[in-house]
Amino acid sequence: VVMACVMAGIYLWIVDHAARGISIENVLKRYRFAAIIYYVRFLLNGAFFYLCILYLTKKYLLPDKSTFFIGFPLLLLAYLMNQGGLTKRGRVMEGIFWFVLLPLIFVLILSMANLSWDELAVRSWCGREMLNGSILVFALMHPIEFVWFYRGDMKDGPIRMRSFAGLMILFLGVFASTVGSLGKKLTMVDPEPVMSMAQGVAMPGGIMARLDLFLIAFWIVGVFCVFSGYLFYGNESIKHTFSKGRIVGLSLSYGGIYVISPWIMTTFATWIRRYFFVFIYGNLVIGLFFPLILFLMWRKEQKDEKI
């Protein structure tokens, strides 16, 4: 987890220096093909996270409800939130951030009563496995690429790392609580070890039986923020590049995902399971190098024009 966060920190440093002072709006207007690529990529990523929300909701909260019933309020909320622009998105996410984060921290604190410190002790390690695991965790952070879309418009200096450091501490807390509660072997074979950890946590006095609901809410809200972010930035890339593409882009993303909800839960889910690592690692590579190349090309052309 620590190595993955270090990799993510290096990623942010690259973005900070490559995109500083350059609005991605201008870059996409110059390279229109890039706007189309971003729209298609972000639509696929949005479908993936939409699938995650539907899966979590149907499995843990509303098992008898259809995907259309669950998906409609999600897409409507995402649309209303995104129509207000980046500022409104930020305010909405600020409003729900502590609402879901504090219960998660509470669950992690209670889980400490069940920790086995022997399970957390490192008695041997393999450098290759640690590197592979670190790269996988880093790849799972691929929505970090959103920073390319607003770094150039930031006027208050370099990217601050305080919130990123807090995220690393949160990841370490989830990791320690899960492995310390379930043990290494069970964590490796359990398909959803974090949920199993939360289900084993008990509140003193038995006041509340299902503390895993806090964790479910955290995952759903967190995934929703990423899902709506992909739809927002995908449509923003089209809106700023093609003057008549906004309505078409909105219809294909919000309406299209809703119409094909059953397909997403069946065929698309099968593809994701089969090619999961291709999807994750491909996103990581493209999300880093594609915008980096675009911004470097922009800087070179601007420099040549001045000469």
PLM features: residue spans?
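Membrane helical hairpin/interfacial module
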Residues: 1-69, 73-76, 285
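Selective recognition of specific alpha-helical transmembrane segments in multi-pass small-molecule
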Residues: 2-14, 39-49, 77-81, 97-112, ...
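Hydrophobic, membrane-embedded alpha-helices of multi-pass small-molecule transporters
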Residues: 3-11, 38-42, 46-49, 70-73, ...
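Hydrophobic alpha-helical segments and their helix-loop junctions in multi-pass secondary transporters
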Residues: 46-54, 98-123, 291-305
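Membrane-water interface regions at transmembrane-helix termini and the short interhelical loops
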Residues: 52-58, 75-96, 152-155, 271
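Membrane-interface loop-to-helix entry segments
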Residues: 68, 81-111, 279-290
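Membrane-interface interhelical connector segments
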Residues: 182-211
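Extracellular/periplasmic helix-loop-helix junctions in multi-pass membrane proteins
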Residues: 242-249, 261-285
